[in-house]
Every structure is written in structure tokens, then in C-alpha cells.
């Protein structure tokens, strides 16, 4: 590295050789060479420009809730956007920066008596991550409420994408197809009754707590739903609930979750994912595709 990122950006918190297990919801993941925590779009843009100029590999993550970082970690510069978290409501719109928590965004919408985001009340991710994968729950998904998304291109240019340009599909948006980085999102909502909005959010959070193993570290829903099947039922019917590899276990509460019950590693998670895929395919002929984003490098043996 010809220039030191720490010396170049004294105003931005940057950590060297930092374990990403401190930031992922699974509490697993290897070290990142450098982790930066920008607080604004301008700081993020400056970091991207620096990485390009220095030929540094660049990885951007949000709340790391539906993410597995392999035990070998991530080379180059990793940007975590969770300090870019401003949210404001204006008229029937809510604008949220990419690092804002979805849960916090739903609370702002409710406070402004705006309806449409209730389905997301318990989704643990960031706004940017939710757009990246078109997150959804309880019959709703981001594609139904997003108006525009502002991104930084790999060249460091700001660009606004409208709904059609995002080409939303099941757990997919065009953000996955390019190297653009989401920096803010505008949600188009409708006027509603605040009491009813809050009641619906409370109802969904109660449902989520009853059905999902929220008391354990996990990466949320591991697999996409195959057409014509329910993922949890396939895994349950394969007899895999309670199966453990290392410290990773298929949840007894919800078969679609793999939880960290005893100091699991990312390798435990990867081994469990592959095992579940293998058994379900052997039993039912169905290939489970991962919904969780998997990044980073394997541990170098030697």
C-alpha cells in the first residue's frame, strides 16, 4: 500500500486487522485488513476514491444481519455504513441513509403517521442491505415502498435510480449486479392512522418473537424459498432441526435459521449450509439456494 489509509483519513474512525465477528449478527467472521466507519456520503465517497487510487479491494457492508464473513476475513478496505443513519419524514416520504436500521426507519414512518412499512418492523438489517436484497416479511417487501435509491458508483459519482431501474425481484435488485453502493433511500408511503400502524407493527413483532430464535445469534433466513415449497418445512421434514456442526445448530424453533449456540465459526456455518443443502436434495430433490450473503476468504492452511 503506497499510502496509509489511517494517516489519510484522521477524522474517520478506521481500525486495522479488526475481527468482523464484532459486527456480524452471527458473531463470526475473520479479520478485515482495514475497517472504516464513515458518517456521511462525502466521507464514503472519499474512501471509495482512495481505494480506487490505491488499487485496494473494497467491500461495503451495512448491519451485517444477513451476512456471513468467512474465517479468513477480508482483504483491503471494508466500509461499514452503520454510522450513516439519518432518517427524516417529509410529507408522505421517508428518506433514510443506507446505514440506518430498518427498524428505526419503521418507527420514524409510524411517528409521522405513514403506512406501508409495517411489514418491516422487525427486520434486523440496514436500509442499504434491505434494498440490496429486496428484503421482505409478512407479505410485504421493499419493492412495494421504494421510490428512489441514491448510489455511489465505483467511480465515486452520485446517481439516483428510480424504481424501474432497480429491477426488483425475489430477494434481488440490480444493486447486486453492479458495484454501486447504496447511500440513501426514499420511501413513498401513504397517510395512515398512527395507532393502527403501531398496533400492526406490535402484532408482527410478537409473531416474529414467537416463531424465530431471536434469543440466539444468527444470520436470519439462510435459504431462499424454492418455488412450490416452504424452506423450513423441507428442513424440518429432513429431520435436521437440532443438528449441530461445531457451534452452529439448525434451530429447533424455526428450521430456516442456523444459530450460533457455542462459539461457532463461519466455517461451522458454511459446513452446516452445505450439509443442509445436501440432505434436502437427497431427500426431496430440491436445491436450496442461499439467501444469506457470503463474503470473504477461507482460512489459508499452512
Curated annotation (Swiss-Prot):
Give the protein's biological function: Cell wall formation.
State the Gene Ontology BP annotations: cell division; cell wall organization; peptidoglycan biosynthetic process; regulation of cell shape
Annotated SUPFAM superfamilies: FAD-binding/transporter-associated domain-like, Uridine diphospho-N-Acetylenolpyruvylglucosamine reductase, MurB, C-terminal domain
Species the sequence originates in: Lactiplantibacillus plantarum (strain ATCC BAA-793 / NCIMB 8826 / WCFS1)
Needed cofactors, names only, are:
FAD
EC number assigned by the record? 1.3.1.98
Q: Quote the catalytic activity from the record.
A: UDP-N-acetyl-alpha-D-muramate + NADP(+) = UDP-N-acetyl-3-O-(1-carboxyvinyl)-alpha-D-glucosamine + NADPH + H(+)
Q: Show the coiled coil region(s).
A: none
**Domain of life from the UniProt record:** Bacteria
Please provide the record's keywords in A-Z order: Cell cycle, Cell division, Cell shape, Cell wall biogenesis/degradation, Cytoplasm, FAD, Flavoprotein, NADP, Oxidoreductase, Peptidoglycan synthesis
Pfam families reported in the protein's UniProt record: FAD_binding_4 (PF01565), MurB_C (PF02873)
Where's the FAD-binding PCMH-type domain? Answer: 27-192
State one molecular function term (GO). Answer: UDP-N-acetylmuramate dehydrogenase activity
Active site per UniProt: 171, 221, 291
**In which pathway is this protein known to take part?**
Cell wall biogenesis; peptidoglycan biosynthesis
InterPro entries xrefs: FAD-bd_PCMH, FAD-bd_PCMH-like_sf, FAD-bd_PCMH_sub1, FAD-bd_PCMH_sub2, MurB, MurB_C, MurB_C_sf, Oxid_FAD_bind_N
| Protein name per its UniProtKB record | UDP-N-acetylenolpyruvoylglucosamine reductase
Subcellular location field: Cytoplasm
Provide one Gene Ontology cellular component: cytosol
